[in-house]
Amino acid sequence: MSNQSTNDQDQIPSAEDTNDLIAQRQAKLDEISAAGKIAYPNQFKRTDYAEDLQKQFEGITKQEIEENAANGGKTQVSIAGRVMLNRGAFIVIQDMTGRIQLYVARKELDEDSLALIKSLDLGDIIGVSGYIGRSGKGDLYVHIEQITLLTKSLRPMPNKFHGLADTEARYRNRHLDLMTNESSRNTFMIRSQVISGIRKFMLNERFMEVETPMMHPIPGGAVARPFITHHNALDMPLYLRIAPELYLKRLVVGGFERVFEINRSFRNEGVSTRHNPEFTMIEFYQAYADYKDLMDLTERLFNQLAMDILGTTELTYQEETISLKAPFARLSMTDAIAQYAEGFDMSKVADRDYLADYAQNVLKQQVKEGFGIGKLQTIIFEETAEHKLRQPTFITQYPAETSPLARRNDENPEITDRFELFIGGREIANGFSELNDPADQAERFHNQVAEKDAGDDEAMHFDADYIEALAYGLPPTAGEGIGIDRLVMLFTDAASIRDVILFPHMRIKH
């Protein structure tokens, strides 16, 4: 069997062939050690990156490069990367920025260098020093003067044409996915840009970045089922955080008037194209602001991110054009029900019996005896309207029953000063004016405990320490959480949340 430089790039090896290829590669590594050479050298000084060189020489012709070299102006470079193609006269390597060709001038290289080039397999990592040239086809290349094997790849790479066609294989072997899939690499580079862009925006708005506990003695800050663990030394249960909210608001009580945290939260719930048990979010709080101020801030943030990363406020998501240009649409929950719930009688929007009947018999949703008007309205909204909110839309006036941490509206205490932002039929952000009345908060915690006792695993616990902190005085404050994974999905046109998480949770493969 010929070596991989001319064979295993063009077909998918069988299991037997894979074992043969691994054995061949191991033999090559053994030869290096037997010759008294360092198998994994750690000394190579890279001076350049592929993308930087492509940009530096963009528009400079082959003739201009050669004339410059003839006049003593060779551009010397040192570059390193993974071998993606080896066709004898030309090698293609890939580094963190992209790909570039290497030119093999056989008459100018010594025997050791030629032997090394001949033995290269796809996936090997090499370092090259030489000078810049351009091929007759116009491709930029590095003319090899010195070449060093830095790391021997002992396993064959996925086929460059078929790649990792199986989606699950891509998730389980993200290192291979990134190695062979340019689209996947771009996705995670954009993810990095989104996070750094959010951080830059918040710092410019005078927010302070903070860190709060990942393990909580009492789960809180959101209505969700937590992961539970046990602290052996303290002999007490701990909960992976479902949200950092209650800790962040303690910081506002303490005098940090604008705080934010970008970190993971955990919810022991279902896995889908929109949900992962471990997810990344930014949560932030601003004193002397209300929920309307945060809607305005969110519009500015999304507009800035789109312009900085995409160069436009219009993007395409799943073949649908979405505009992130402000202002976003704003619609109350009941108005959304009126607009999207087919056959719904709006004259009975506050009639519990009618709401329960519609939810159960029209929408086929489970209705429990303890569900109030607000809970039923929320169910109907989620089932009839949520997925139809394609363009950015703030839904406001959420019921107090389903918003245990939000401030009641001054004119109608049955609703709260809260919003959720939907884009592409998915919730992207949730924010509200914060409840800062300790007596009202204690009452709502008691209601949540009653729901938990009635069998609702997602209802909140009573957090006495937080009530005590509120009693010292929380200034008028608004807070918001933005799901970064879903935002990245939007910016990268990803159909599944797993496409934008480097290592999504998967069932163990036996």
Swiss-Prot record:
The protein's enzyme class: ligase
GO cellular component, one term: cytosol
PROSITE patterns: AA_TRNA_LIGASE_II
Cofactor remark: Binds 3 Mg(2+) ions per subunit.
Source taxon at top rank: Bacteria
InterPro entries attached to this UniProt entry: Aa-tRNA-synt_II (IPR004364), aa-tRNA-synth_II (IPR006195), aa-tRNA-synth_II/BPL/LPL (IPR045864), Lys-tRNA-ligase_II (IPR002313), Lys-tRNA-ligase_II_N (IPR044136), Lys-tRNA-synth_II_C (IPR018149), NA-bd_OB-fold (IPR012340), NA-bd_OB_tRNA (IPR004365)
Catalytic activity: tRNA(Lys) + L-lysine + ATP = L-lysyl-tRNA(Lys) + AMP + diphosphate
Main location: cytoplasm
Cofactor annotation: Mg(2+)
A biological process from GO: lysyl-tRNA aminoacylation
Keywords recorded for this protein, A-Z: Aminoacyl-tRNA synthetase, ATP-binding, Cytoplasm, Ligase, Magnesium, Metal-binding, Nucleotide-binding, Protein biosynthesis
Residues reported to bind Mg(2+) 2: E427
Family indicated by similarity: Belongs to the class-II aminoacyl-tRNA synthetase family.
Subunit structure: Homodimer.
Record-given protein name: Lysine--tRNA ligase
Lineage: Bacteria, Pseudomonadati, Pseudomonadota, Gammaproteobacteria, Moraxellales
Gene: lysS
